[in-house]
Design a protein with these regions (language model features):
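Active-site scaffold of zinc-dependent metalloenzymes
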Residues: 20, 28-53
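Auxiliary, metal-adjacent structural segments of Zn-dependent hydrolase domains
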Residues: 1-32
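Post-HEXXH active-site segment of zinc metalloproteases
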Residues: 33, 53-56, 66-87
């Protein structure tokens, strides 16, 4: 199964991050990479003018960088996490 660049998949990624107590917000800003992660506050801000594809790639990049423990992942998100780390 490949990653589908749809709003539904974007929502799955947002819910995955929220299950680890991160807040995902879409706002305008001048981020060099298109997003900003406030690790201490567990807040993720993504440029709201990104396309759906850009938002998904940003979310995937963030998930890969924040050291999510797959063992503590809720069952409903394990499939999504495995898909991300497979690619």
């Amino acid at each position: 199964m490949d990653i589908k660049l749809t709003k539904q998949f974007q929502k799955k990624l947002e819910l995955l991050l929220e299950s680890f107590d991160y807040k995902v917000r879409f706002e305008k800003g001048n981020f060099k990479s298109g997003y900003c992660v406030l690790r201490d506050n567990k807040v993720i801000i993504i440029n709201k003018y990104f396309t759906t594809e850009g938002k998904i790639y940003a979310l995937i990049e963030i998930i890969e960088s924040i050291n999510i423990n797959k063992d503590n992942c809720p069952i409903e998100h394990k499939k999504t996490l495995n898909l991300i780390f497979k690619n």
